[in-house]
């Protein structure tokens, strides 16, 4: 999992143009991953969607959404050229990752992370496969809207195990896009760090 995070972060950094403010960033404090088995859909196009309502505390704080094809092993990561798009629906931003399921993939990992400070809500995760040209099928996902009755609010997800006294995760019963609940992530007191480092030999 750690290698996956490094790969995704490097990929994100490599595709971003730096402004002066982007020489600073927040270290990643929290993430969760939805795994989707895909052996039955190899070679087909897919769409993955997640709704986010973000109230960042500053311009550097943000949500990051990524995805990757994964082979048989847990660290068997396959180069994945997915496209990320977004649209607004009321007070929510719906992020869509689209691409093709690799012929050697056993699963897709979809990764959501919070960098920085603020309140962030996640809800209404969905996954679609193009079974024939123009014919999309929605594939059921467990706990897609954080409505599970399990005491584990991350039932059906991988989640960062890093302990933090600056980040709180909980289910919100007051802010949600569909159903009656969403995942709320509240982060505070984090400090940005510089991308520029100086080393001496």
Where are these regions (language model features)?
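Bacterial Sec-dependent N-terminal signal peptides
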Residues: 1-22
